[in-house]
A protein has these predicted regions:
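Exposed beta-strand and adjacent loop surfaces of beta-rich binding modules
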Residues: 68, 84-88, 102
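Short beta-strand-plus-loop segments that form exposed binding edges in beta-rich domains
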Residues: 143-151
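Disordered, acidic Ser/Thr/Pro-rich linker "stalks" and the adjacent N-terminal cap
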Residues: 1-63, 76-82, 106-117, 121-122, ...
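Extended extracellular/luminal ectodomain segments enriched in beta-structured repeat modules
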Residues: 54-55, 63-72, 137-140
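Short, surface-exposed tryptophan/glycine-enriched loops
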Residues: 122-140
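Surface-exposed loop/edge segments in extracytoplasmic proteins
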Residues: 95-102, 169-170
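Short, surface-exposed beta-strand/strand-loop-strand elements in extracellular ectodomains
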Residues: 80-95
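Extracellular beta-strand elements of beta-rich domains used
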Residues: 4, 71, 89, 160-162
Length: 174
């Protein structure tokens, strides 16, 4: 059984991450970056998308500075595409962007991780669990996307979930 980590739960299918706002290079109609932290992981019509206009980015502000040791990126739920392939995650700490060290993707042992932190997955996967050296005082998390497995290079980032202390199992997708 897989677990997604978070602080506040509503039910086994919904949770609330401690993000409070976001900005993005583009928000596709009906797919605002705010939907990537609304706690809904069971709907293909929910999440952040950008009309396939890459490179694309979204930055998610946390409610308070916190220590993050892992991050889950859920994409393309109820789809056979619109999932991440090439992307980069960085954390805003003390007025600068930091790339996580010792970065790994749990579900893809063949993922290529460049020296600048850019991750290229071997195939599209619905859940990318990123582990890395702990980063303290994180204010925001940013994802830069350059490639997906969709024909139009669009993404639906269903949820972005930072590691927090409590765990709750999610149902059929994980």
């Amino acid at each position: 059984m897989n677990y997604i980590l978070f602080r506040k739960s509503i039910s086994s299918d919904h949770f609330i991450a401690d993000f409070v706002s976001c900005t993005a290079s583009r928000n596709q109609g009906g797919y605002s970056c705010q939907e990537a932290f609304d706690g809904s992981v069971q709907n293909s019509g929910n999440g952040w998308a950008y009309d396939g206009q890459v490179p694309a980015w979204a930055s998610f502000k946390l409610a308070e500075e916190t220590k993050i040791t892992s991050l889950r990126l859920v994409s393309g739920i109820d789809r056979n595409d619109h999932r991440l392939i090439t992307f980069k995650v960085s954390m805003h700490v003390n007025n600068r962007w930091v790339v996580p060290g010792d970065l790994r993707v749990k579900e893809d042992s063949e993922a290529i991780i460049a020296s600048d932190g850019t991750i290229t997955l071997s195939t599209g996967i619905h859940v990318a669990s990123l582990s890395f050296n702990p980063i303290s005082n994180v204010e925001s998390v940013r994802i830069d996307v350059t490639k997906t497995d969709a024909g139009n290079n669009n993404l639906v980032l269903t949820e972005i979930i930072p590691n927090f202390a409590d765990a709750l199992p999610l149902s059929k997708y994980f």
